[in-house]
Amino acid sequence: MKRLDILAFGAHSDDVEIGMGGTIAKYVKKGARVGICDLTQAELSSNGTVESRKEEAKAAAAILGVSTRIQLTLPDRGLYLNDEAMKDIAGVIRTYKPKLIFAPHHQDRHPDHGHAGTLVEEAAFSAGIHKFEDSYKQPAHKISEMYYYMINGHHRPDFVIDISEEMHQKIDSLHAYQSQFVKSAHSVETPLVNGYIDYVKTRESMYGREVNKAYAEGFITKKPLLIDDDLLGG
């Protein structure tokens, strides 16, 4: 199993694309191996089916150039801190040995998103403990850093990543989720089918404007960032 440089976790397929699809495309262009892990099958989604979501997720991953997409089967609306979930997530981390991990920020209107971030953070810690036994019985692995992306929230980020050249890929990856973002005659009314992609574009535009770029994605970190570049640009 080839190790990943970046592994991004989401509660549901489309979470990662909403929060950091542009960043994924950017790092893939740089030669990084990037993976996505969907914790649930989104079986309680108002629109679409488990089968259609899987096909849409596959298409979105191809648009972004993702190396692998992992599907866990934790319960939708049941992402709580428990041994089984921790062992499954820690097993994924140990199997793919990423340098960086991303997960949803805890402040979000959907409880599953915040719970997913907490679960992944706890599992990442456990994955580094040699005596902790995960679901796949893999050796311990310690990640370098963990960062949090935003899904529904629009919070003050700790840092942003310029995605001006990758914004079209991000939007294309979201359009792959026709069942979620495109209103049809049979759609259940949700915030996602009422201009949600336009909201995402506006948010990334606002983050970009703060750093004189067309578009940027915002991230939260619990640790200080070490700046290697000269602040004076030398």
Regions found by a protein language model. Name each.
Residues 1-96, 220, 229-233:
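Active-site rim/loop-helix segments in enzyme catalytic domains that contact anionic ligands
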Residues 2-7, 83-234:
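Metal-dependent de-N-acetylase/amidase catalytic core
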